[in-house]
Amino acid sequence: MSRADELYRQTCIDILENGFSDEGLEVRPHWADGIPAHTIKKFGVVNRYNLAEEFPIMTLRRTYWKSAIDELLWIWQKKSNRVCDLGSHVWDEWAGEDGTIGKAYGYQLGVKYQFNQGQEPMDQVDRVLYDLKHNPASRRILTNIYNFQDLHEMNLYPCAYSMTFNVTGNKLNAILNQRSQDMLTANNWNVVQYAALTHMMAQVSGLEVGEFVHVIADCHIYDRHIPAVKAMLEKDGFEAPKFVMDKSVDDFYAFTKDSFKMENYKFHEFKFDIPMAI
């Protein structure tokens, strides 16, 4: 089984056996039928992935990795908040009448700031790219899209909100901070996205990949997802596939979802419909 499978299994078992249930409490999320969507949660989950050893994609069920990377590029490369710029319909329900998700996610990464006196303003992504090449020893290479000033104009508050990059020797390490994580629908989706981002940032900066650390504040399983999660945990996973990235790309903005391959990706069938809490 892949390392991603192992950590997913450990996290889910810990939540189910030792987590806190908010059943009976007033909660914001609800199901499509109007019934409150309750969870079992653990606080402060930290999972570490050595990207130099294997790519962290799960095999207990299929992760649609190409769609996940397409979404990441929508946020980090296009810096867009328009759902029509995305190749899937994942975000359609959060789009307003103007076809955007408000000042969330990609919008925040596209805002330009005056970082240093005398330098031209640049956005957060370009600042990361600049520092990785020119200031790799810096401890300030990070992004943060949880902008309190704009929260009232976001159709969805950012869940994965901050990336910190750290260069150790010739290796690029990264930490993703996430305030909330739905384990069934989004955990490995997010892990795949930001592991791929770390690979991209490393390649265009002339670095090797190191460790990807995923820090989750509220890590939860929804009540109606529990049967599906338990069924997944009964399976034995497969070995991780081989992650292949186009080595000729040296410009972050030149990557596309077709710049990647997942060779020999084996996964178990998943026969459950997944209701979405909103």
Regions inferred by a protein language model and the residue ranges of each:
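Terminal, non-catalytic protein-protein interaction segments that mediate quaternary/complex assembly
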Residues: 1-278
